Amino acid sequence: MSKQLDLSKRLQAVANLVSPKRRVADIGCDHGYVSIYLADVRKCPKVIAMDVRKGPLSQAQNNIHRFGMDDRIEMRLSDGTALLEPDEVDTLLISGMGGRLIMRIVSEGLDRLGAFKELVLQPQSEAELVRKFLREHDYIIVDEDFVIEDGKNYPMMKALHVSCLDEWDRESGQQHDAFTLFDYSVKQQDLFGPVLLKKRPADFCTFLDQKRKKTEEILQQITQPEKRKEMQDYLQQLIDVSKGM
């Protein structure tokens, strides 16, 4: 590829979570830049760029052609994983969607196709529900990142099916058991991310600080007892996990 592809901070972080040389389905590919990056830089031998809308898929196709990647990336007009075949990809990548939609797409894929080796997810909302969903469906979060871009918070995660953990240990040189954090409750790990709590990237620490201050402000305005108790509990969670900063 002769042209230079510059990804946004968020998309670069998402792309970096995809393991190199894997077959990838990019669900909701939008403009196709991540698919192009994966095929070129991450050396993924098979990339399927998928979107439910004709407009974004057409734009992605134009970009893929512009970067000379027509023979490296396949395009499919598909609602989620509907047009994927069993064992066609190793990695399912979904970014820029709400948490509940991501869970629905993954759940439908698991029901129809069986377990994917790797899930790379960037939920725009309800990341804690996505983490809980992964845990309940035999996926272990082995890496995470957190990006603040244009004033918006973007958590993202890589999860492997339990059947693939030994393979990941060998390839990465890490032990997945190292991500078990006994200092934090399951609730705290779901809320804030087990690997984020361990790695503490700069944007994540900024998020925790801003979230704590905002929660304190909101708490002063709440008078309804149940809502106040709920907000106090959340503030305490923030204070507890922030102690490691």
Regions found by a protein language model. Give the residues of each.
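Glycine-rich SAM-binding Motif I of class I
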Residues: 32, 36
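Conserved SAM-binding motif I beta-strand of class I
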Residues: 46-51
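Short SAM/SAH-binding signature in class I
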Residues: 88-96
